[in-house]
Amino acid sequence: MQSLTIPKQILEDLVAEARRAAPQECCGLLAGQKMHVTRHYKITNIVATEGAEIANFDVAKISHLQRLTPVERAEIAFVMDAREMSMAFKDMRANALDLQVIYHSHPQSPSRPSLTDIRNATDFESVRKVLNLAEPVHMIISLENQAAPVLNAFRIAEGKVSQVPYNLT
């Protein structure tokens, strides 16, 4: 499996962003070409806003999320702001970049995809294919141990998860 290459500064920025957002989840996109990341797009996690769309979660999670305040929701889930995502994709097209990574943080849990993460990634597959987007890597930043954040990258296809190695430049 081909490894992902990420500039050290972008990785440091992801950790800093996750720490600033904690206890809420942060999220965003990384772009580049051929598994080489060159650009970072921080996207607002709107799940904490009143009236945020939570219908894309499974029924059990929706039931749980509905009992929480918007701020509490953002501690265990994320929904990217559609307008900001659209602007990021427009910038990618203008600069001949492809989506390489979809990232988010787990402020209090390990750096591995949750069942909701797997379901959302699997749902995104059909959209990605229609839009002719590159297959993204999913990166999770864990702050479970604040002193030593853990970042792991994964391919999620057809509900199956495989770890993707990454290198820093």
Stretches with model-predicted labels:
Residues 1-100, 110-169:
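Conserved beta-strand-loop surface patch within small alpha/beta domains used
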Residues 104-108:
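Histidine-centered divalent metal-coordination motifs
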